[in-house]
Amino acid sequence: MLLLALVGLPTARIFAVSEAGTAATLAFHQVDTTSDIRVERLRAFLASYDSPLTADAETFVAEADKNNLDWKLVAAIAGVESTFGKQIPTGSYNGWGWGVFTGTQDGVHFKDWAEGIAIVSEGLRKNYIDRGAKDIYDMGWIYAANGDSWASHVRYFVDKLESFQPTEVAQLPVSI
């Protein structure tokens, strides 16, 4: 009977890597986000920074899954580039410093946070990972002029998010 009960469960793709030397490895997860603890953890984490990105936690996770990215990566980059969306060019919704290389001071403007998350996620997949970047440090040399420093800061926020535990009752997920 247990087998019959398990047949209807959603499947998940999880790629594991050996533990040694994986501090900056890009891990991929694909899970249904409707009841996903990652969404709740990210939402609480962003709220702890009073981030305008808080309401888009589900978008971060869904776009990460869609593009086979570590679900923490795009949020961590926003932490480095804009203090999680709090310091951006007015009206740009560009919390990632995306497109600053174009010569404009404020880079690309997105219509909203969701569009920014989607475009940055897809861009990281196509322009970094699909072109051989295997970890945040590989990405850093393409993404930022100060590659290793940038990557270390992104890694810091990935690690903080990974270990984050909501402590306020309002931040704890409740299931009935």
Model-derived regions: residue spans:
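A short structural micro-motif
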Residues: K66, T83-F84, A145-N146
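Export/targeting segments at the very N-terminus of extracytoplasmic proteins
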Residues: A27-V74, L161
